[in-house]
Amino acid sequence: MQIPALADAEELTCDVLVVGGGTAGTMAALTAAERGANVLLLEKAHVRHSGALAMGMDGVNNAVIPGRAEPDDYVAEITRANDGIVDQSTVRQTATRGFAMVQRLESYGVKFEKDEHGEYAVRQVHRSGSYVLPMPEGKDVKKVLYRRLRRREMRERIRIENRVMPVRILTADGRAVGAAGFHTRTGAFVTVRAGAVVLATGACGRLGLPASGYLYGTYENPTNAGDGYAMAYHAGAELTGIECFQINPLIKDYNGPACAYVANPFGGYQVNRHGERFVDSDYWSGQMMAEFAAEVASDRGPVYLKLSHLPEESVTALESILHSTERPTRGTFHAGRGHDYRTHDIEMHISEIGLCGGHSASGVRVDDHGRTTVPRLYAAGDLACVPHNYMIGAFVFGDLAGADAARFTAYEGELPPDQLRAAHDLVYRPLRHPSGPPQPQVEYKLRRFVNDYVAPPKSGARLSLAVEHFERMRTEIAQMGARTPHELMRCAEVTFIRDCAEMAARSSLARTESRWGLYHERTDHPERDDEAWLHHLDLRKSPSGAMEFTARPVEPYLVPVDGYAPTGGTPRHLGEIHPEQVATAGPRDRAPIGSNTATRTPTAKAASHSPRILEALALAEGEPELGAFTGYLTDPDPAVRSAAVAALTESAPTGVGPALAARLADADAGVRAAATRGLLELVEVLDPEPELRTGLLRASMGSDPEVRAGALEVLRALRLGDAPHYAGLLTDPDIEVRLAAVRGLVSVDAQDELVRATTDPAREVRVATARALLSPTHLTPLLDDGDALVRAAAYTSLAGAGCPDDLAVRAVAALADPAWQVRAGAATALSSAPEPLAVPALTTTLTDPNADVRKAAVLSLRAQATPEARTALAKAVNDADADVRAYASRG
């Protein structure tokens, strides 16, 4: 498709723009229309079957029905489940308005289970509170809502645009004024001016990668890719609790819930493989998930939903609910495995991570009417941070947002041109390079990083690596290619997922404590810290474009809860959260510093457009004789000669070795480098002929250090060099050449010549020499070297060379060296030392603070193989380090 001009955008106007036609979005549209507003409802799929609700629903999790539950009890329950970090005013809206919403939905045609007396059949699932209200025909809820939207009085006020996907909320004068997006079937650019905007795009369900590896095999509806999180963030709204992930128990290998809360009233329950109940937590929370995860990982796992003990009528009733309402494909899944609830309990596992305000607490910050921190921008449903809000809460806040937004009329000013251009570029960028990396590959890589570095248990190091990966992937995402409007939609979703991934990683870094059980388990900050962190963690996009954070104290509760006493107070501005320095051997101010190496300036290659380049490269497609390359290898253009060298390397005709060696003397550094790489690449198949040896010897004495080092490596590999030649290059000014000379001397067993390198000015050369020397006499001077790594290498080599009494005494003394590398080397040396000296010293070393030193001691004790050594090893089987434990256990 062609990129449409920005000037050709289709412009729509409304009083209230609702983005997302799922649970909250449909209710927001209905309420706003009932209040007299002209509503535009945008849905990137089709409203009739979009959103999480369309995947099936078996009941209401949080129905506060008068006579069966009290609003204040529910508020307290949710406060405890969320470890005290809640805005009770929002939770109380769901508690007090939920029953009226049930009745409203019932008036639309949604069916809720009732008993013989016509009373709502509320079930008790947890050890306190009765909030679960089954919906025997929950699969039809979206159909009922769509029917309501299509009523004549609603059609007069609500315009539905299916297959239109907003990508950015437009703002002017600090408030929301519309949106920009595109049509996912035609590709047309669409702009909307609105008096208010309600975001109801659901969770970010496509954040982590499912265990199956399927991009769309997620627990949540996979079309919910975090669109609203990203749009709210870029519009300047605050998000909060993003570090509190959504993680759910599910059926193993199936992207749907096990529905233990449905089975519990029938007598089903979760058990480990021994049939034992194991969940101590009293409410569906991160703490429950922590218990669940621990049980799965223990020798008591796997974990099951036990149903096989139930009577036939209970099983039949459960089948009628579970196979037709929540995930209707469930029955097919079990049948495909030959499983039946009567004979097989259901193996459970843990879902991938996601962001969801309605099932955990990660969402857009809203007040008790769904208002965000950006005027006239609202959020509702799973996108909004109203902890454990579930379906009824989504309906309630959709209603609240729609009612409040209906106060505003359409924006009449100019839509911001800079924001329109940015949105246009975001949408159509993949069309500019249609052959770029496809969305599935880029998305898979992105979400694999989420699993590897962001999913709990979390640590500062892994989260820091996550930030690094997500920052780098901005470029890869910008290079994605697309050819159709549908592919454009998927590419845009990947940008949303990346934004959410970065928010998740940085938020998790910012909260330096553990809270919410498994949802935010920090291995480097394992304790909950209410004094410092009984705070909401808010994030926003600063005016400079950086992601910045604020710790906002929890306001005093409306409903007191034992164990928590928030007092509010002044927010603590944290600013940007920077990743820790990781992926290095240690802090750079303490790491060993190598010798200065001459800087090699990369060769700048002038652009060449000679057709002979293509001709030379084309030679590799056939099986040419060496003579076919001659003219190209001597072409005046170095780019042609480089291309000829590459083709020659690829085709490798007879005589390739001497031909490449001849190019080592080329006048152009790029050609010489290509020839060096070619020889190293082909070294295993080269014929060690005299002509090649002559060319290599000549090149090893040339002016190019890269060529000299490469020529020495090929000489060594082909056994064409000799000790005098290698020894003569031990004084070469380039470190890499001297290292190659050391390796050459080792290859011809020239120990006497090798000793000359023990005084080399470069640490790297001395270390290589120490590792190669085979005589304690030759190694002794290096034990006094001023560099710790050289001493460590020398002691390590004593293990193979033999460690006589006098050197064993020195090794024992070296166990107290400040450098752990030296201590580890000394411990290794003692493996070949006399037992009376070695074993007592090694036994003491088992308490060294460095794990690698302890590991070296264990390995040396195993080599000693005396009763005293075995006694010492028995003490190390409970060491904190896995390697130490493993080797000690092998005795």
Which ranges hold each PLM region?
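Glycine- and aromatic-enriched mobile tails/lids
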Residues: 2-13, 35-37, 46-48, 104, ...
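N-terminal Rossmann-like FAD-binding beta1-loop-alpha1 element of flavoenzymes
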Residues: 16-40
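Short hydrophobic core segments
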Residues: 17-19, 192-202
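Conserved redox-cofactor binding core of oxidoreductases
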Residues: 49, 101, 106-193, 203-210, ...
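Glycine-rich loop(s) and the adjacent beta-strand/alpha-helix scaffold that form part
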Residues: 199-257, 391-404
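An anion/pyrophosphate-binding glycine-rich loop and adjacent beta-alpha core
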Residues: 231, 237-347, 404, 408
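Amphipathic alpha-helical scaffolding segments comprising HEAT/armadillo-like alpha-solenoid repeats
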Residues: 598-602, 622-632, 653-665, 685-699, ...
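Alpha-helix N-cap/helix-start positions at coil->helix boundaries
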Residues: 607-609, 638-639, 669-670, 705-706, ...
